[in-house]
């Protein structure tokens, strides 16, 4: 299994629709101001956060249960900047839609710009033949409110291609998050 380069990422995005919309280079400025970068890097792709958020609140529940999650635990928010309360988290989604090839697995890591501020971005791997918008989790580990910027970079996706194609892909299994379009809550 080897990591894939910028050349491979560009080819797969442009010829096979692996990432849509796709940015072939690195974008670091918009409208004359610096932003958290996004687009193709040497061995990965920096994804952007869309402007749809679900901010966690503990007002309506007393326990978090991943097998029986209460959607009233979130407040919906739409905007260019999301403020995450201290020691809390928010869910969002990528601006990009992904179609992962059958021989590829991705790992997604948060950008250091956020990590250095105590904001952790968590995303699970994109499995072979998974497709959809990626649900992102932003954890604010600080005792202060934290900002997340929509339309800017938030995490980097690394693509690994196997020497042999898997026997059963995410699509073959009928994965529960296949084809997700909005910010998707946990499903048991």
From Swiss-Prot:
CDD domains: trimeric_dUTPase. Pfam families: DCD. Keywords: Hydrolase, Nucleotide metabolism, Nucleotide-binding. The active site is at residue 137. GO terms for biological process: dUMP biosynthetic process; dUTP biosynthetic process; nucleobase-containing small molecule interconversion. Gene3D superfamilies: 2.70.40.10. GO terms for molecular function: dCTP deaminase activity; nucleotide binding. Its EC number is 3.5.4.13. It comes from the Bacteria. Pathway: Pyrimidine metabolism; dUMP biosynthesis; dUMP from dCTP (dUTP route): step 1/2. It catalyses: dCTP + H2O + H(+) = dUTP + NH4(+). DCTP binds at residues 111-116, 135-137, 156, 170, 180. Homotrimer. PANTHER family: DCTP DEAMINASE. Catalyzes the deamination of dCTP to dUTP. Belongs to the dCTP deaminase family. This is dCTP deaminase. It comes from Cupriavidus pinatubonensis (strain JMP 134 / LMG 1197). The lineage of its organism: Bacteria, Pseudomonadati, Pseudomonadota, Betaproteobacteria, Burkholderiales.
